[in-house]
Design a protein with these regions (language model features):
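Flexible juxtamembrane loops connecting transmembrane helices in multi-pass membrane enzymes
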Residues: 41, 45-48, 240-272, 287-293
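Hydrophobic transmembrane helix bundles of membrane-integrated enzymes that assemble
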Residues: 2-29, 44-63, 68-254, 299-385
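Long extracytoplasmic/lumenal interhelical loops at the membrane interface
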Residues: 259-318
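Membrane-interface helix-loop junction between the first two transmembrane segments
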Residues: 35-40
Length: 393
């Protein structure tokens, strides 16, 4: 059986965007690996500067007219960029610029390019770690060894695979074949075997189950639009629910204690962080201490304190203003999905909303390509329907 590799056709007006995006993806994936020790300090800022300059040049060359929506979007993006950049959130600052500059490019095309880049980087990094070119750190917990596979934390590689899984599901939709599902299960299982990352593996399996249900029109997918309407508010519901749990958490309440234990102490750590650092309108730099290694394989010193909830991390690091805009924009994006009857995108974004309650990696573009949907749906050219997948080709 021959393997077909389809390379999306890139227009002249898109070339600078994809050059910039490729540089960004490669750099910020490498930033998560032991390869990063060979790069100069603050290399991420230099990369961000180059990417932004390329994107600005592409805007000047390719965009003839800026409509009112694009102008409002630009103002909001500049505000969010300033907030994130000032708190040293280089990857997030870059993400905001890419979301805006990718507004007129097919999300399907971006998704396919992302898959190719990510697969290439995963192969390069994993093989490099096995060949001894970079370190393959191993954690031993109980009777199980967890390999980092060249990354600086065991969860990073599986998180990239999870993103690939969601992108494949969205690209294929009803055309997703059983051989595709089996290949994705094998790929996820491969990285689960070496890293024991249950979260990414479990969510990948869940997303594939949803894809199968959607493919064969089981349960409510054809008629129950009320469920889809509820999904529109996924980000508001998930953020409010988990924040409420953190604020009211008490070990004296048995069900809360059991839930906290099940979630790996996330409620307790989140509450402690809120009490320790508080919240502000514009955010601030916070030196949380996690389990990840530095570029030389050393663990951070100090007591462990990490906030895995994306919503609370955004609230504390980037501030109330950023979080309000973030949730409002995402809710409007979900509403547009509902209006366009793009139910697959609506469901996948809802799954990501749930995932964000317990995993902050979803904030970053190299782990979550679906942020591009914001620009395409809200700021893209009016002639692009962005409804069902076939309308985007």
């Amino acid at each position: 059986m021959k393997m077909k590799v389809y390379i999306p056709k890139i227009k002249n007006t898109e070339k600078l965007f994809f050059v910039s995006y490729t540089i960004y993806m490669i750099a910020f994936i490498l930033n998560q690996t032991f390869y990063w020790r060979y790069f100069p300090e603050k290399m991420d800022r230099y990369v961000l500067l180059v990417c932004v300059l390329l994107l600005a040049l592409n805007e000047i060359v390719s965009v003839k007219i800026i409509n009112f929506r694009s102008l409002i979007g630009l103002i909001i993006c500049l505000l969010l960029f300033a907030i994130t950049y000032s708190t040293n959130g280089n990857a997030v600052a870059g993400m905001i610029v890419f979301i805006y500059c990718g507004r007129n490019i097919s999300f399907e095309k971006i998704a396919k390019i992302t898959i190719y880049i990510t697969v290439f980087m995963l192969v390069l990094i994993t093989v490099s770690s096995w060949l001894g070119i970079i370190e393959n750190h191993i954690d031993y917990r109980g009777n199980r060894a967890r390999q980092y596979l060249g990354f600086r934390y065991t969860l990073y590689a599986p998180a990239l695979i999870y993103n690939i899984t969601l992108l494949e599901i969205y690209i294929k939709q009803e055309k997703l074949k059983w051989k595709n599902i089996i290949c994705l299960l094998i790929l996820n299982g491969f990285f689960f075997f070496f890293t024991n990352s249950r979260l990414s593996f479990g969510l990948s399996v869940l997303s594939l189950v949803i894809a199968v249900i959607y493919k064969y029109k089981f349960v409510f997918f054809n008629k129950n639009h009320f469920v889809y309407l509820i999904l529109v508010f996924s980000y508001l519901i998930c953020s409010g629910f988990f924040y409420g749990l953190m604020v009211t958490f008490s070990r004296n309440v048995l069900w809360m204690k059991n839930l906290n234990d099940f979630l790996g102490n996330r409620l307790n750590l989140g509450q402690y962080s809120l009490l320790e650092y508080g919240i502000s309108a514009w955010g601030k730099q916070i030196a949380w201490v996690g389990n990840g290694l530095d570029v030389y394989g050393n663990r951070a010193t100090g007591s462990y304190l990490w906030v895995d909830c994306l919503y609370v991390q955004v609230l504390q690091r980037y501030g109330v203003i950023f979080l309000i805009i973030f949730l409002l924009v995402l809710t409007i994006t979900m509403w547009v999905c509902y209006q366009k009857k793009n139910y697959m995108l609506l469901m996948l974004l809802s799954l990501i909303a749930v995932h964000c309650m317990i995993d902050d990696l979803q904030l970053y573009l190299h782990y979550n390509t679906f942020w591009f949907a914001i620009g395409s749906l809200l700021l893209g050219r009016s002639k692009e329907k962005y409804g069902k997948l076939k309308q985007m080709k």
